[in-house]
Amino acid sequence: MEKNVVKAEKNVEIVEFTFGPDEIAEAENEIVRYVNKNYTIPGFRKGKAPKRIIETFFGENFRDMVLEELSRKIEDTLKDEELFIPAVIADRKIEGDVAVFVVELHREPKVELKDYTGLELSVPKQEEVLANYVDNKLEELRNEAAIVEPKDGPAEIGDVINIEYTIEKDGKIIADHKTQEILIVEDDDRPIVTNVIGKKKGDIVEFDRTFENSNNKYHYKIEIKEVLKRTLMELNDEFAKSVASEVNTLEELKKKLEEEGLEAFESWKKDFLRQQVQDKLAELVELEISEKTLDYFVNRAIENAKKENTYDSYLKQAGSEEKLYEEFKTGILNELKKNTAIEKIAEKEQIEVTDEEVMKTAEELSTYWGISPERAKEIVKTREDIRNDIVENIRRTKVQDLIVEKATIKEISADEPVEEQKEEEEKEEAGSENSENKE
């Protein structure tokens, strides 16, 4: 077998393997031995069929079987090669007395890691967030403590209504005399809400509606069983004492809520900054990666989408197979860059994940898994795939936190978009301008 590198493109080597007549004959004999051992050829005792008869019996398939046997020899030759993805046999054929295989060897792409210090991140101003938190919590407490009493007049924004409804589809009842309590709020534009505003106890409302992406028509019949007026308490010391026994004044309640909000804000801020780092990771590396490697990942993703019956919905959203292919490719390249950035930064900063950290995470996950901490630890010890996922998650978080520590963090007003949102808006504006120019 001769091996010859005929072309190199970024991380991919195109290698030609050539087998001579003796090697082809050896592969043919191997196939003959296999067939005689596992099959019975009509007219011959098992194991006694001659080569020419087996060739005739299998026809063109015999040649394919020989090529498969030679493919296995190539796989054996490459088993110790360090490859990014499995070797891809792009072409194989027998020409005369030689067999030629064209094989793509995908090496790990070369990586250029950029400077990850001083990354620009942003968070909303703490005082604004806390002020909004306190205001929202106070309003929430007012709603929870609202005084509710029957009302004779029509239902209005802020009222509570008790309804009984029946739904028909194609003349068949699919919901019969169901009851529901609804708080009427200004932004709720559901027909079941908008159609009862202004109605009184005992009124009956009927209407038809359809739902998005469906041609089915549903007929609703609603009876107003009761209208309840909600009266919200004034924000004063009496209100504060009624909703929190440990405080005596409204200011004390606000202070308590602010402390709660600060704790929640610090936890949220940590995750918020980590997510910003995650979104920027792809910008921190340059990958010298071939289109052939990306095509491999895209085709595999498409195959998985078809198996999971999600391909058609993806295709509908994309609009065409070409656009969907490019969307897959962009997403895959982005993820490859992010994962590579995590890996290279962890190597450079000598970030390690200890067994203690893995077991601690297993304990924390036990609640979500619905099992004991001891059982969770045992699973992590015996399931290498789960352990690897945990290790990768811990490593990713450590890298994110390190980048945050080295970042430049800017406080912005709560209504000011963060950097990623600005970039998206700029892209949308550019896209709109391009569309207008085309028109």
Curated annotation (Swiss-Prot):
InterPro entries (UniProt xref): GreA/GreB_C_sf, Trig_fac, Trigger_fac_C, Trigger_fac_C_sf, Trigger_fac_ribosome-bd_bac, Trigger_fac_ribosome-bd_sf, Trigger_fact/SurA_dom_sf
EC number(s) recorded for this UniProt protein: 5.2.1.8
Protein name according to UniProt: Trigger factor
EC top class named in words: isomerase
Domain notes: Consists of 3 domains; the N-terminus binds the ribosome, the middle domain has PPIase activity, while the C-terminus has intrinsic chaperone activity on its own.
KW Cell division (keyword) present: yes
Any one GO BP annotation for this protein: protein transport
Keywords: Cell cycle, Cell division, Chaperone, Cytoplasm, Isomerase, Rotamase
Residue ranges occupied by any PPIase FKBP-type domain in the UniProt entry: 158-233
Enzymatic reactions: [protein]-peptidylproline (omega=180) = [protein]-peptidylproline (omega=0)
Localization annotation: Cytoplasm
Primary residence: cytoplasm
Function field: Involved in protein export. Acts as a chaperone by maintaining the newly synthesized protein in an open conformation. Functions as a peptidyl-prolyl cis-trans isomerase.
Protein's UniProt keywords contain Cell division: yes
One protein family per Pfam: Trigger_N
GO cellular component, one term: cytoplasm
Single GO MF descriptor: peptidyl-prolyl cis-trans isomerase activity
Region (Disordered): 410-439
HAMAP family: Trigger_factor_Tig
Taxonomic source organism: Kosmotoga olearia (strain ATCC BAA-1733 / DSM 21960 / TBF 19.5.1)
